[in-house]
């Protein structure tokens, strides 16, 4: 996303709110929100998000001619739009439960880069290909329970803590193959097409499905600058996350197709969100902000599933998933 585009969005979403924030609060005295509503329902769009999943593995333990890493795959999508619905219920004075769910409504721009390495003659890249990305995109569910920790002086806002579960799934489909780099691997039978070769146009060649199951612990806060305008933030640390990743290489007749490679492991992560909130009418709010999610593998394995021979496992050297972008939404409290 270009700097001018970001600046334009900031101007549209943030500057009107700042201007409204300086209006005297007494002018809005009749529209102030009740102290703590029982229910809040929201619809939100995660706009122009960029996503990335990348992983690599080390198969040199099976064949010392292979590099370390042996392969590195990077899936990147751009300007994907995600629709999100959420509900929050306050109960027993200081407790609340919140559920968020989202799914992609536009997901068709991106690139897969597939790098392969040889150790013959020293570690070197001998093949690089790129493919166009489509797929079902991203879906997620967050389910949290929280506690109202404190109110700020003069009823200016509050600070809450929460713990919960996050399910985050991303599926990429890579279509077509463009050979960018091809050099001698030094490994008998391991070759590539000449650089510049384009093949399998319009054909899905790889399907990759990533699933993270995560424990979240975090804090969230809202601070009122006026009776209508507030700023808010949310920070969640993920101390434990379980990864499941299936990779199907549709052109590889020597590999099984359900899946060709499977990956699993444990990691950590973080979710960060900051934004502003403006009451347009009693109980109705416009929300705008920015969000960043990240999950990172600490330890895991890749298992290859060949046809006719036993499966074999090798260590993953990297696996991480991230997504970031602006948010814009409408919420109602009652």
Where does each model-flagged region fall?
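Cleavable N-terminal export/targeting peptides
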Residues: 1-38
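Short Gly/Pro-enriched loop/turn and capping motifs at secondary-structure junctions
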Residues: 281, 291-298
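Membrane-embedded beta-strands of outer-membrane beta-barrel proteins
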Residues: 85-87, 141-145, 161, 217-219, ...
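Residue-level signature of outer-membrane beta-barrel architecture
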Residues: 87-91, 147-149, 221-223, 227-229, ...
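Extracellular/periplasm-exposed beta-strand and loop segments of Gram-negative cell-envelope proteins
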Residues: 51-80, 103-141, 167-212, 239-273, ...
């Amino acid at each position: 996303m270009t700097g001018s585009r970001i600046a334009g969005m900031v101007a549209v979403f943030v500057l009107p709110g700042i201007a409204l924030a300086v209006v005297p609060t007494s002018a809005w005295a009749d529209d102030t929100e009740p102290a703590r509503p029982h229910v809040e329902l929201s619809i939100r769009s995660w706009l122009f998000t960029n996503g990335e999943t990348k992983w690599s593995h080390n198969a040199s333990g099976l064949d010392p001619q292979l590099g370390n890493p042996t392969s590195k795959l990077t899936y990147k999508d751009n300007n994907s739009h995600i629709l999100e619905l959420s509900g929050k219920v306050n109960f027993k004075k200081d407790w609340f439960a919140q559920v968020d769910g989202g799914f992609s409504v536009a997901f068709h721009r991106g690139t897969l880069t597939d790098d392969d390495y040889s150790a013959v003659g020293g570690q070197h890249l001998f093949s690089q290909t790129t493919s166009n990305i489509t797929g079902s995109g991203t879906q997620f569910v967050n389910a949290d329970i929280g506690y109202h920790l404190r109110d700020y002086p003069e009823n200016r806002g509050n600070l809450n803590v929460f713990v919960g579960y996050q399910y985050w799934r991303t599926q990429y489909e890579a279509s077509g193959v463009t050979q960018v780099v091809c050099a001698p691997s030094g490994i008998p039978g391991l070759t590539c097409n000449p650089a510049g070769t384009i093949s399998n146009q319009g054909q899905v060649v790889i399907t990759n499905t990533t699933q993270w199951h995560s424990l979240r612990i975090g804090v969230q806060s809202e601070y009122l600058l006026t009776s209508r305008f507030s700023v808010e933030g949310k920070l969640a640390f993920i101390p434990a996350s379980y990864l499941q990743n299936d990779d199907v290489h549709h052109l590889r007749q020597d590999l099984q197709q359900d899946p060709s490679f499977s990956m699993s492991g444990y990691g950590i992560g973080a979710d960060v969100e900051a934004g502003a909130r403006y009451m347009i009418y009693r109980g109705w709010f416009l929300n705008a902000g920015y969000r960043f999610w990240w999950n990172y593998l600490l330890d895991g394995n890749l298992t290859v599933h060949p046809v006719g021979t036993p499966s074999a496992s090798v260590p993953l050297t990297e696996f991480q998933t991230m997504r970031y972008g602006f948010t814009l939404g409408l919420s109602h409290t009652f």
